[in-house]
């Protein structure tokens, strides 16, 4: 990793006087496995002041118990109780209000493809038994009974089969749709701005749209992992008529180039086979590929400084609705425990929490992105290998490198005379990756 050590420093003093001009959503951060009270504090002290536009929070519906593993929050038991791993209903509502007051929109992860497996008492006190298809709001007739998913080349098998054996809700049922829509409308009434739709590719697009329509058509981004050899009916492009869709290929393309030659990123966008920019929800990684779920090939926090640089590029480059991952470490005695739940400590108080959103390399680029929103790329420069620079319209330039040699590329500043005053204060509004001043950070 010695040849990829660098530091990204935004000239924050120059940018500090700029007002936020982000698009409606702005940059999202996924505070993975954070408690609601901690999220509220982060909105007020970091996310709002630094210009983040939104925060994704864990599914707030009551769910299967088991804080020692992270995935229990993705096994809901009912949609009428809001006591979850993140906190109680009062803490949830307080967090939403406080984040909104700080200028940070709240997007709730929503799981309604399936319900929890096993039996017992949920985090909100509800009883369930998956063997008998008994849940507080649902019974046997509210589920599909088509066995497990065995063939991703058959869309009906994917939509109606059980994912990892989890009871598959019949999302085509009006009753089921109404229960989920009521849950979503409750959250919207409390101030939630929208939803991430988990496992959307495992539901027919028409079902997802019907539920969202009944909920009042809130803003949503749908998790659809495209994969070669699978049915064309479950590819990301089949869901874009509903709303924004996760573009996992963006992350794998970034990784391939940051592990190769970043000069090729000059044309990154729809011409690479990616979704249209206004339909793409993009990230360097998220909680699934980080744990080798849902496909691999992405950079993660384990790649250290290279990962930071990829995030910096994502925030500087004009493509998609962007999300930064805020993760935690899950090593144990030299091995990776991918099921491991969040550390018991308060976020960002020890080394178990990564808190990527607080790193200057990433945090300061949010303001860069906000200030350059809507500006085209111009003045591209590269050295034919791993040093690049480009400007964003008349506002900013971003040089970067993945090599450890001292360099400072010459990049024309597109400074019109009419903006001399603001540019005089700005000097060089640039994200500067300076390997010569880099400090080693463990991968």
Curated annotation (Swiss-Prot):
Please list the residues that bind substrate. Answer: 114, 196, 201-202, 228, 287
The biological process GO terms on file are: carbohydrate metabolic process
The stretch of residues making up the signal peptide is: 1-24
Q: Which domain of life is it from?
A: Bacteria
Q: Which UniProt keywords apply?
A: Carbohydrate metabolism, Glycosidase, Hydrolase, Secreted, Signal
An example of a Pfam family matching this protein is Alpha-amylase
The top EC class, named as a word, is: hydrolase
**Any one GO MF annotation of this record:** cation binding
Quote the EC number: 3.2.1.1
> Which residue positions are annotated as catalytic?
198, 223
Q: Into which family does the record put it? A: Belongs to the glycosyl hydrolase 13 family.
Name this polypeptide is given = Alpha-amylase
Source organism: Aeromonas hydrophila
């Amino acid at each position: 990793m010695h040849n990829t050590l660098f530091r990204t420093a935004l000239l924050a003093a120059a940018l500090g006087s700029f007002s936020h001009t982000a698009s409606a959503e702005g940059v999202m951060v996924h505070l993975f496995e954070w408690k609601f009270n901690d999220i509220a504090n982060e909105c007020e002290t970091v996310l709002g002041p630094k210009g983040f536009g939104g925060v994704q929070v864990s599914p707030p519906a009551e769910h299967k118990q088991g804080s020692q593993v992270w995935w229990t929050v993705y096994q809901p038991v009912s949609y009428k109780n809001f006591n979850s791993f993140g906190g109680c209903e009062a803490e949830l509502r307080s967090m939403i209000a406080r984040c909104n007051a700080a200028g940070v929109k709240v997007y709730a992860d929503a799981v309604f493809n399936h319900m929890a497996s096993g039996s017992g008492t949920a985090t909100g006190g509800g009883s369930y038994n998956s063997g008998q298809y008994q849940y507080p709001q649902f019974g046997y007739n509210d589920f599909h009974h088509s066995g497990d998913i065995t063939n991703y080349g058959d869309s009906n098998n994917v939509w109606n089969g059980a994912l990892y054996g989890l009871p598959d809700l019949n999302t085509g049922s009006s009753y089921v749709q109404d229960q989920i829509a009521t849950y979503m409308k409750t959250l919207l009434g409390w101030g939630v701005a929208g939803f991430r739709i988990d496992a959307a590719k495992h539901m027919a697009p028409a079902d997802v749209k019907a539920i969202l329509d009944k909920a009042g058509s809130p803003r949503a981004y749908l998790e659809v992992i495209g994969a070669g050899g699978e049915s064309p009916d479950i590819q990301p492009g089949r869901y874009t008529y509903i709303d924004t869709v996760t573009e996992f290929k963006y992350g794998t393309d970034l990784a391939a180039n940051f592990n190769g030659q970043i000069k090729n990123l000059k044309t990154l966008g729809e011409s690479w086979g990616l979704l249209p920019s206004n339909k793409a929800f993009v990230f360097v990684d998220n909680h699934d590929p980080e744990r080798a779920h849902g496909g691999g090939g992405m950079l993660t926090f384990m790649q250290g400084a290279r990962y930071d640089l990829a995030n910096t590029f994502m925030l500087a480059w004009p493509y998609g609705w962007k999300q930064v991952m805020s993760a935690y470490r899950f090593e144990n005695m030299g091995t990776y425990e991918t099921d491991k739940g969040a550390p018991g400590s308060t976020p960002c108080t020890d080394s178990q929490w990564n808190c990527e959103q607080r790193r200057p390399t990433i945090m300061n680029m949010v303001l860069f992105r906000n200030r350059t929103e809507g500006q085209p790329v111009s003045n591209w420069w590269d050295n034919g290998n791993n040093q690049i620079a480009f400007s964003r319209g008349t506002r900013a330039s971003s040089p970067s490198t993945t090599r450890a040699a001292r360099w400072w590329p010459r990049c024309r500043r597109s400074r019109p005379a009419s903006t001399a005053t603001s540019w005089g204060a700005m000097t060089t509004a640039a994200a500067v990756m300076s390997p010569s001043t880099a400090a080693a950070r463990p991968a």
